[in-house]
């Protein structure tokens, strides 16, 4: 006789076999019978909306809501007043008879995606991974949620996106929309999705962050859920690949005791109904075993230490369209031979992801400041088992000079180039030769557009950074500095947005008072630190300046995550180009200052030009993994004002007229 619990278990297993390829899809099957009056070529069909005008596709919140509800099994709760109001709406019915048939065919096409066997396998993989993160696979009573680092999430997304697209090529758009919803990354654009679908990805991560540890459950759940998948794992040492293989086998047997699991000849196999899923484990000293294989996923662990002969074998999988290669390694930079993957930073494809505690702009701080262990502009979320402080730095460097920066911090190959960037002749000419911009003889030849660049800083620490403001105009091929400010907040209790805007507006109005010939103001407000504050500063400037001086004022606009243009500018990789453009023009004598230069924040006893020359002298070049960057910060001197001048000149040179708009 069977016990009641056995009967329930058998019945549940039987039902799962019967409905293995079926799913309760919550797409509404009720035909939205509402007429639309426009040409047929403008009509589109959506399961939730029925027949609508094509411009509805550009209403992102509407389609985002439809996509989300399509993937959610529970019904949405609507409050009674809204439900009552919606029920009173009446729509004109469609007269044509074949419209409902078209709708049903379209609906069947949508629901077939959710019944696709491969989609169900992908969904089951994601569900199992969610359960593992929640601790459901552990036998202990106390379940602890596993917290993944961003790079681990990125690896998972890279893998599942590529496998989904290659396994479901005809339904690629549907599965990508579903995955973006599941991973809550619906904000990413198409170019970012293309990066996730690339055939090869490289992750360079500091030591002890769980690179190998994370790949073990990924392999386990892929073997369990994706039928017929073939996985390859290559390590730099035999004992590493053997350990990973045994750990994968152990976890598979513990997590999925009902599965038929075998481990033989360095291959782990999980048998499904009609096909097997396999994972092959090899070291770089025995890569002959991976030759002739057809992997869906090839993981290359500690790639920097893989033998060159083995690497050529691994690269042989690049032409295979169905193979995703994941290169994972530590960010070792003490030796060029064990950091060659950093060269991929110059690749036309964005395939390199580097996790570091220090950004490229502040890597020199590790050398300049004895106790510096973190980056000033990064907020580091490190695992609880990682502890980095000044004592760790001193101890590591006592054992081996440079070990802290190279082996622990994940610092890149960094060299501060001491070659002279600014010539002495250029500095002397900039200091002594200044134009009188209020002279009637020169005014007809001066540009009528004034570019103002504002780099806000929200701190009262004068040793850190302040707000840099620069006003730049043109004189033929030359650039003239009309005004500059280096402003520090008096108190954190003050309204920082209003204070910064007040400082900039005073300078702008003073420049306009002396130079009334300007007809247009083009203002660029950097929003890297705080985008909402940049928008507030723009609004205050617009209101303040337009009341006193009627000028055509435009602001540089950038699209935010909702694709809405906002009055701020995000400084990115163009900073290097801007600095190089500044250096070439400065040394050529094309950058001058006005004799009537305005500055309210630099001391009266201090010449503003001499003040900025001190920052220009500090400008130096930093080479990081063949990537060139520039910096002018020293322990006692910041570079905020210089950056504002450089970027104002660069924006004046670039033009980008379409990005400047009124607010």
UniProtKB/Swiss-Prot annotation:
Keywords attached to this entry: DNA-binding, Host nucleus, Hydrolase, Viral genome packaging, Viral release from host cell
EC number: 3.1.-.-
Motif segment (Walker A motif): 205-212
Motif placement: Walker B motif: 297-302
Summary of the function given for this chain in its UniProt record: Component of the molecular motor that translocates viral genomic DNA in empty capsid during DNA packaging. Forms a tripartite terminase complex together with TRM1 and TRM2 in the host cytoplasm. Once the complex reaches the host nucleus, it interacts with the capsid portal vertex. This portal forms a ring in which genomic DNA is translocated into the capsid. TRM3 carries an RNase H-like nuclease activity that plays an important role for the cleavage of concatemeric viral DNA into unit length genomes.
Location in the cell: Host nucleus
Top-level lineage group: Viruses
DNA-binding recorded as keyword: yes
GO BP, one annotated term: chromosome organization
SUBUNIT field: Interacts with the terminase subunits TRM1 and TRM2. Interacts with portal protein.
Protein family according to the UniProt entry: Belongs to the herpesviridae TRM3 protein family.
Gene Ontology molecular function: DNA binding; hydrolase activity
GO cellular component, as recorded: host cell nucleus
Pfam families in UniProt: DNA_pack_C, DNA_pack_N
Entry annotation: catalytic residues: 302, 455, 526, 640
InterPro entries in the cross-refs: DNA_pack_C, DNA_pack_C_sf, DNA_pack_N, HSV_TRM3, P-loop_NTPase
Protein name listed in UniProt: Tripartite terminase subunit 3
Main location: host cell
Lineage summary: Viruses, Duplodnaviria, Heunggongvirae, Peploviricota, Herviviricetes
């Amino acid at each position: 006789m069977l016990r009641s619990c056995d009967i329930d278990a058998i019945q549940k297993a039987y039902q799962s076999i019967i409905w293995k390829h079926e799913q309760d899809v919550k797409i509404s099957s009720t035909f939205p019978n509402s007429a639309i009056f426009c040409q047929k070529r403008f009509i589109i069909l959506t399961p939730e909306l029925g027949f609508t005008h094509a411009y509805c596709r550009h209403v992102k919140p509407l389609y985002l809501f439809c996509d989300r509800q399509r993937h959610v099994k529970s019904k949405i709760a609507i409050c009674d007043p809204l439900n009552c109001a919606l029920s009173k709406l009446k729509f004109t019915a469609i007269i044509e008879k074949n419209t409902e048939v078209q709708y049903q065919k379209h609906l069947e096409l949508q629901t077939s995606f959710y019944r696709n066997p491969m989609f169900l396998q992908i969904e089951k993989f994601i569900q199992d991974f969610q359960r593992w993160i929640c601790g459901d696979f552990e036998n202990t009573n106390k379940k602890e949620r596993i917290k993944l680092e961003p790079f681990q999430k990125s690896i998972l997304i890279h893998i599942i996106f590529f496998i989904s697209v290659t396994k479901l090529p005809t339904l690629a758009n549907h599965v990508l929309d579903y995955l973006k919803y599941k991973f809550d990354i619906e904000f990413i654009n198409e170019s970012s999705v293309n990066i996730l679908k690339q055939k090869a990805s490289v992750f360079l991560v500091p030591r002890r962050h769980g690179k190998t540890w994370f790949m073990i459950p990924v392999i386990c759940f892929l073997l369990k859920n994706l039928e017929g998948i073939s996985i390859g794992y290559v390590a730099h040492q035999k004992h590493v690949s053997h350990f990973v293989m045994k750990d994968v086998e152990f976890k598979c047997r513990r997590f999925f005791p009902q599965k038929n699991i075998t481990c033989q000849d360095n291959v782990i196999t999980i048998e499904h109904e009609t096909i097997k899923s396999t994972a092959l484990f090899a070291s770089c000293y025995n890569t002959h075993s991976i030759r002739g294989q057809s992997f869906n996923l090839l993981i290359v662990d500690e790639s920097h230490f893989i033998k060159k002969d083995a690497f050529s074998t691994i690269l042989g999988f690049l032409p295979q369209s169905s193979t995703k290669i994941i290169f994972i390694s530590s960010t070792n930079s003490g030796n060029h031979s064990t950091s060659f993957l950093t060269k991929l930073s110059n690749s036309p494809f964005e395939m390199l992801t580097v996790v570091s505690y220090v950004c490229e702009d502040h890597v020199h701080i590790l050398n300049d400041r004895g106790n510096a262990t973190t980056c000033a502009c990064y907020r580091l979320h490190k695992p609880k088992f990682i502890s980095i402080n000044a004592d760790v730095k001193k101890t590591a460097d006592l054992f081996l000079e440079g070990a802290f920066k190279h082996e622990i911090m994940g610092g890149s190959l960094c060299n501060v180039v001491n070659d002279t960037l600014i010539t002495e002749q250029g500095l002397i000419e900039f200091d002594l030769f200044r134009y009188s911009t209020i002279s009637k003889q020169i005014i007809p030849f001066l540009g009528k557009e004034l570019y103002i660049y504002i780099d806000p800083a929200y701190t009262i620490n004068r040793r850190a950074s302040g707000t840099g403001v620069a006003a730049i105009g043109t004189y033929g091929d030359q650039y003239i500095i009309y005004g500059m400010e280096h402003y520090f907040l008096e108190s954190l209790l003050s309204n920082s947005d209003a204070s910064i805007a007040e400082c900039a507006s005073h300078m702008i109005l003073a420049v306009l008072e002396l130079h009334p010939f300007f007809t247009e103001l083009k203002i660029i407000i950097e929003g890297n630190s705080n985008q909402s504050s940049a928008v507030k500063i723009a609004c205050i400037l617009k209101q303040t300046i337009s009341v006193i001086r009627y000028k055509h004022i435009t602001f540089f606009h950038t699209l935010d995550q909702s694709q809405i243009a906002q009055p701020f500018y995000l400084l990115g990789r163009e900073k290097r180009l801007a600095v190089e453009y500044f250096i070439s023009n400065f040394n050529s004598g094309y950058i001058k200052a006005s004799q009537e230069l305005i500055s309210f924040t630099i001391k009266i006893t201090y010449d503003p030009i001499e003040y900025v020359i001190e920052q220009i002298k500090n400008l130096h070049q930093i080479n990081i993994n063949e990537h060139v960057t520039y910096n002018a910060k020293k322990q006692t001197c910041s570079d905020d004002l210089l950056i504002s001048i450089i970027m104002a000149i660069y924006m004046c040179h670039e033009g980008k007229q379409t990005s400047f708009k009124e607010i």
